Curated annotation (Swiss-Prot):
Single GO MF annotation: GTP binding
Name of the protein: Elongation factor 1-alpha
GO cellular component terms, semicolon-separated: cytoplasm
Keyword GTP-binding among record annotations: yes
Species whose genome carries this gene: Thermococcus gammatolerans (strain DSM 15229 / JCM 11827 / EJ3)
Gene this protein is translated from: tuf
HAMAP family: EF_Tu_A
Amino acid sequence: MAKEKPHVNIVFIGHVDHGKSTTIGRLLFDTANIPENIIKKFEEMGEKGKSFKFAWVMDRLKEERERGITIDVAHTKFETPHRYITIIDAPGHRDFVKNMITGASQADAAVLVVAATDGVMPQTKEHAFLARTLGINHIIVAINKMDMVNYDQKVFEKVKAQVEKLLKMLGYKDFPVIPISAWEGDNVVKKSDKMPWYKGPTLIEALDQIPEPPKPIDKPLRIPIQDVYSIKGVGTVPVGRVETGVLRVGDVVIFEPASTIFHKPIQGEVKSIEMHHEPLQEAYPGDNIGFNVRGVGKNDIKRGDVAGHTTNPPTVVRPKDTFKAQIIVLNHPTAITVGYTPVLHAHTTQVAVRFEQLLAKLDPRTGNIVEENPQFIKTGDSAIVILRPTKAMVIEPVKEIPQMGRFAIRDMGQTVAAGMVISIQKAE
């Protein structure tokens, strides 16, 4: 049997109006992956005589977006010769940051779209910092709107230099920079004849070369629980995605912070595992599974609990403990000071956390400390802080289990900051 093509999740990032949606639209249009409902609408309008025009499709997508129906560009799939690619999200969705962190899908790579007409803009920087903070290691740069600068190589080189400077400061190496026109279809799927000076890959060729994401099977087992069902004749069935490690029938698993909160181990032997209604003997990272655990009741566990092996249980941070984190403030109306208590979202959990200390303000580009013990931090700042959860929760240092160490901080219906756990300080 031929090995299945690797699945890769990508996000599109970049400044507003630089052409992210158009680029996604063009990728889907030229690979014949436009959502069914749009094609249907086209046919219903009796426009069979006209060629299926890109501009028309983009207008429909835009209309539906404005009516508040996101054509879920999110979770749109297409194939390249060597990859199955899922576009998991694009900013502009209000919950973009939260989705990137707590979403069922961690991005393997990002496409940074920069308009040749503008170059690097504030959001270009913010999204690039964010990609770094969220552990996206592979980036592809698309310099869009080349048609608006007459496909001029000099303009391309100038913008390319700006982007390279930004990304290299953030520690990115070896990334393709591709001149495209999403609107005209140059170098997205089809090679352009308008830029003979460019010898590199098209966008789809670059996507086809994204490294296969490694499966973290050597890390300790962690399964954040999304839901808990009670199934007649089976019993309690927690459902979640295996983030790290391997779960096998017969393993003994423990749930945290449930065990800490109930002051008794909520644990048992795994009797069965199912994925898409098929029984499995073992489940690997990325698998969305339901599993039945002997002796664990429906009221013992809930969304936000995490399953791990009893030999290496999930790390619990209690209200008497604290953790040190590096954050980037994305959107706060005034300033964050000690005592601020927003809600932290990580994997499937959400818990209010208190800012206990502001240890240092960092230069977001270099990571160097620019100020010790600042009085406050504001939008655009990167900082090292000490946080204390208001109730027990599972979170892991990002160096040990990166999948379980990233978080979003939300308040007033928006994402205020994104961050990662550096270390955990347990109270005696």
